[in-house]
From Swiss-Prot:
Has antibacterial activity. Acts as a ligand for C-C chemokine receptor CCR2. It comes from the Eukaryota. GO terms for biological process: defense response to bacterium; innate immune response. Monomer. Interacts with CCR2 (via extracellular N-terminal region); this interaction may preferentially require specific tyrosine sulfation on CCR2. InterPro entries: Beta_defensin_dom (IPR025933). Disulfide bonds join 26-53, 33-47, 37-54. Pfam families: Defensin_beta_2. It is found in: Secreted; Membrane. It comes from Pongo pygmaeus (Bornean orangutan). Residues 1-20 form the signal peptide. This is Beta-defensin 106A.
Length: 65
């Protein structure tokens, strides 16, 4: 019975992992289509289905392009 309760608690509290491989890419594959952009992201374009194309803001010291 303890094993069942332990397994139930572990499986109940696990969150599903997010797979970045299947996310829709945009902005020459440098952005991701989302409902809302995060704090460290900027809106660079619009995607289909009224989604926003967000790209992570790079710090000034490390500009990679």
């Amino acid at each position: 019975m303890r094993t069942f309760l332990f397994l139930f608690a572990v499986l109940f509290f696990l969150t599903p992992a997010k797979n970045e491989f299947f996310d829709e890419k945009c902005g020459k594959l440098k952005g991701t289509c989302k409902n809302n952009c995060g704090k460290n992201e900027e809106l660079i374009a619009l995607c289909q289905k009224s989604l926003k194309c967000c790209r992570t803001i790079q710090p000034c010291g490390s500009i990679i392009d």
